[in-house]
Each structure stands twice: as structure tokens, then as C-alpha cells.
Amino acid sequence: MIILSVIVPIYKVEEYIVECIESICNQLISGVEIILVNDGTPDTSMALARNYIAQKYPHFENQFVFIDQKNQGQSVARNNALKIAKGEYIGFLDSDDYLLPNYFYELIKVINEKKVEIIHFNAKQYDTDQGYIDSMCFVKENKVSINNELYREKLFLQAYWYPWLRVIRKDVLNKFQFDANVYMEDKLLFPKIYYFTDGCEIFEMKKELVCYRHRDGSSIRSGYPEPLLKGIDLGIKKFIPTSEAPLYSIIYNQFLAQKISTMIDREQSFFSIYFFALNEVGNIKLNYKISYKVFLLKYCTLIYIAILKLRNFFR
């Protein structure tokens, strides 16, 4: 029986893929499958992964599933992997990142003991530019939490939407898909999932189980490519607050701030930014829970834009 499936899209990671695969294989246990998705990579990343497994860990080959697709982005890669995943729970790993010790042991233990819908955990962050490792403290203490309105408010304000910071039951994920051809697909998907699973139990684990590699080649750090701009626009459309989902205003405001920031960085005219903001903020229904940014954006739009301009100037 497969308890956990971990999905790993692969694209142009020759420099990192062996470290990623080694971090998986040196702790792999029964009940786990690893789905490697070749997202049409033009280099030898997938071949390196296959060869490394075959030569050093042939006894684990039957726990790996290999998918080849034309280049369609990691959203489609994850969606295709979800269709064939056999695990009761689904985890994610980026192919330039790597697992920390006891990832599988700790998660399988929680899955067997707690029977929760979602598991959260912490990670380390390695900055390739600065050459240091730091902690990403998503979870403060080991506990079972109930996914209610108060919990979602805290979660939405934290804004830790990386797929690899959580494991989710497959029957929950099957009701959703990652949006294709956009960046920030995780931020577009996971807030919806947490509303859908209202009332479910979430186990929060303080342990650091993944190391995230922060590097210049990452898509979000490479200027403003079209998929990033599309993702921001889609986020603004998807998260207009409603009476059923008032906390969407937090996500909506985050996307709106990103949109205005990109307009400033791309040197669009002050008046185009001003009128865009005025037009959009009418969708925000303020209440005491919403941050000061929303208040500034709705009632002091010029001040809000000036703050963003100053922030970008001093970066």
C-alpha cells in the first residue's frame, strides 16, 4: 500500500538534480512513491536522475515513477502526476531543492498516528547568492489545529504557500488543479483548498524537513515574465472577497500590492497606477481583521503608491 506520493517536476536543474535525488534515496522507506516529471527539459537533468537511481539505488527503482511531457510548466507537471499518484497523501518537492533527514519517517509517522487531512512543517532556506542557510519558521509548535476562520486568517497573513511546506490528502487535492501557464500557482490554489477543508484537522510539526534553494535562476526572481504578470492578474480576479469568503480580502490585497509594485517597477505612469488602484479597491470590504495596507489602499491611495515607490527606490 502506498501511503505517500511525492511529486518532483524536473526542468533545467543539471547542477542540482543529483543532490535532490540523493536526499530522497538515502532515506526512502516502504509505502512511498516518488513521481519524477520531465517537463520537457532541454538538458540532461532527467537522464542524470534516471542514471543515478539505476546505478546507486537500483533496489529503489520500483518506487519511482517517471513521466515525460512536453514543456508546459510545473503546474501541468504536478497536475499530470496527481492523475496517476497512488498515495493516500501527496507531497511536493522542487528539483533544485532537497529533503532534510527523516522527511519520510516523520511524515509517515504522523499520517499513521494522527489521520489528519493536512500536515504542515518547517524548512531551511539556502541562499545561493549569499551562501548561507536560514530557517523558514512556518510552524511554531507541535500541535493539532482546527482549520476555522481564525486559523485561516493567521495562515493567509503568513502567506507561506510553497507546496513543499505541506502534505495533503489526495482526495482533497483531487478536487482542484494547479492553474497552468502562470507563476504563483501555489498562491492561486492553496487558499481555496483551506476554505474547502473548513473544519478539518491540520497537524503542525516544528521539524525542518525540506531545504529550499533561493537562487537567481528561479522564475519569480527573474524580472517580470509574462506568466508572472498573468498569475498576478488571475489572483486579483480569483480572490475578490465575498460574504462566503471574507478573508479572501487578505489574498486579494497581496496580489493587488504586487500588481501595483510591478506597474511601478515597469515605470508605468503615476496616473495609470492611481486610476487602476482606485478602480480595484472598491472590491475590498474592510473589517477589523484586514491589515493597515488595505486601509491605506482604499482610503489613502496616493500615500500607498508613494510608500511602494519609496520601498522600491531603496531596495
Which residues fall in each region the model found?
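Conserved nucleotide-sugar donor-binding catalytic segment
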Residues: 149-225
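Short aromatic/hydrophobic "clamp" motif used to bind/position activated sugar donors
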Residues: 90
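Membrane-interface aromatic/basic loop that binds lipid-linked glycans or pyrophosphate carriers
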Residues: 266-315
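A conserved acidic beta->alpha catalytic loop
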Residues: 23, 38-48, 94
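Short, well-formed alpha-helical segments that are part of the catalytic scaffolds
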Residues: 13-26
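Conserved donor NDP-sugar-binding/catalytic core segment of glycosyltransferases
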Residues: 102-136
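Glycine-rich, basic loop-to-helix element that forms the pyrophosphate-binding segment
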Residues: 69-85, 95
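Catalytic core of nucleotide-sugar-dependent glycosyltransferases
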Residues: 208-215, 221-254, 259, 266-284
